[in-house]
Design a protein with these regions (language model features):
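Hydrophobic beta-strand scaffold residues
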Residues: 48-49, 99
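Flavin (FAD/FMN) cofactor-binding and adjacent substrate-gating region
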Residues: 1-39, 43-44, 50-51, 57-64
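Conserved residues at the C-terminal ends of beta-strands
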Residues: 21, 71, 112
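Short, intrinsically disordered, charge-balanced linker/junction segments flanking boundaries
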Residues: 1, 232-235
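Helix C-cap/helix->beta junction micro-motif
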Residues: 44-45, 95
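Active-site substrate-recognition segment that forms the wall
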Residues: 57-64, 74-233
């Protein structure tokens, strides 16, 4: 049954599987959903946005937030929500608020393309396969990346933390700050296990130019950071 759901699986390599019909992926990208929400709010007059306007500091009076300093002036406000992900600790530093979050490298390798789905009009052809024992997953990229297969790995033993100050290091990044150079030796063992579960990856070979280390926002307890800080009210 697992093979029927995910034809790329070697059923001899597993003892069993679970199927979650309610699981899903945001396609083509989660950014599209966020952009839709932002534009909808702007059209209703409920939101104003300031693009290409970096925050460079905060105004704080009597341990309470009073404004956001930008390179174009100050925005007066009594509430600030930090939603900058991997850059969150840097924003916290500007307000004197420690944010217990660290960027962690997340290897993403691309294989193919897979002839059976190359040229498809679908964003996703097969269900996403999670190998929990290997802390990894395999999914196809549909038409978004021309039928490539994506393998992602979560380092569960010795995660590679990245200093937030080092995110934009030009010697370590590729086409964007959150895409870092990949060292295949660091993931050789889990990748070999992936070849056993999904041999098609080894047959197709990996695309070095498309593969990279992404960055995840990770907290010490893997939970969310929600609520007002004890150091600065309204922050």
């Amino acid at each position: 049954e697992a093979k029927e759901k995910f034809p790329l699986l070697d059923e001899e390599s597993i003892r069993g599987a679970m199927w979650d019909p309610d699981a899903g992926l945001v396609t083509p990208r989660s950014q599209d959903v966020v952009n839709f929400a932002v534009e909808s709010a702007k059209e209703k007059g409920a939101l104003s946005t300031y693009t290409n306007t970096p925050a460079v500091g905060f105004e704080i009076k009597d341990s309470r937030i009073t404004g956001v300093k930008t390179d174009k002036g100050t925005i007066k406000t009594n509430k600030v929500v930090i939603a900058s992900g991997i850059w969150g600790p840097l924003m916290g530093e500007m307000a004197g608020v420690p944010i217990p979050l660290m960027p962690v490298e997340h290897p993403l390798l691309f294989f193919g393309p897979l002839p059976e789905i190359q040229g498809t009009d679908e964003f996703l052809v097969y269900p996403l396969l999670r190998d929990q024992g290997n802390s990894a997953y395999v999914r196809d990229t549909g038409r978004l990346h021309g039928g490539m297969l994506e393998w992602g790995y979560y380092e569960d033993k010795e995660p590679r933390l990245v200093d937030p100050e080092d995110i934009g290091n030009p010697e370590k990044t590729m086409t964007s700050d959150s895409m870092r150079h990949l060292n295949l030796e660091e993931i050789a063992e889990p990748l070999e296990k992936a070849f056993e579960t999904t041999p098609i990856l080894n047959e197709l070979g990996w695309d070095e130019r498309s593969s990279f280390n992404g960055l995840l926002s990770v907290t010490s307890d893997a939970g969310s950071l929600i609520g007002e800080s004890p150091e600065v009210r309204g922050f």
